[in-house]
Regions:
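Active-site entrance/lid segments in N-terminal catalytic domains of soluble metabolic enzymes
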Residues: 1-127
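Conserved active-site-proximal phosphate/metal-binding subdomains
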Residues: 110-132, 138-186
Length: 186
């Protein structure tokens, strides 16, 4: 997530580090939040473009303002949405794809609290752009379920918190691995 880096320069360093680890394409998430003193969004967008990133997952506020610069750089834009109406708006403004986040997601689940078993089929009925399922996805079984519900793929987020690459304290990682289905709080 781009905003976990305190400055665009730090994001550029992380993009370069990722580039050193793979010759495959990768994406960056950039969340646009309402703020009295917003982050340096133009700088973050420039770091993404200059870093040769191939895909950006935007989240939060409407990304329309940033689409021309990103698309002119050949970057695919996937907007994260927690409702079908927001997904349709993302499609209408020109996003290439949508990440449909059910209530099960580890981040902000939106205001409507719609679980994936309801949200994904509705998105499949309405959207013309590809979409991936997000929220509660963890393995191949999740992928099969997401595909059956109409998505073209899935996002995993929390699942990767326990990896050696994640800059998270080992106690937190161990707690995640040891957790049962009863330890999730929505």
């Amino acid at each position: 997530t781009g905003l976990t880096q305190k400055t665009p320069a730090l994001l550029a360093n992380e993009i370069a580090r990722c580039r050193d680890m793979t010759d495959q394409p990768f994406g960056v998430n950039l969340t646009f939040l309402p703020a009295v003193n917003p982050p340096d969004y133009p700088g973050y967008v420039k770091a993404i473009i200059d870093g040769g990133v191939k895909a950006v997952e935007t989240a939060g506020n409407n990304p329309q303002k940033w689409l021309p610069a990103l698309k002119d750089a050949g970057i695919k834009v996937i907007h994260k949405c927690t409702s079908v109406r927001h997904a349709l708006k993302a499609e209408a403004i020109g996003c290439d794809a949508v990440s449909v986040d059910g209530f099960e997601c580890g981040g902000h689940p939106g205001e409507d609290d719609i679980p994936n078993f309801i949200l994904l089929p509705r998105a499949a009925e309405e959207l013309r752009v590809p979409f991936v399922a997000s929220g509660g996805m963890a393995d191949g079984r999740s992928l099969v379920a997401a595909l059956a519900l109409g998505a073209e793929g899935m996002n995993m987020g929390t699942r990767f918190m326990a990896t050696k690459e994640a800059p998270i304290h080992d106690n937190v990682k161990q707690a995640l691995v040891a957790a049962s289905e009863l330890d999730t709080r929505l």
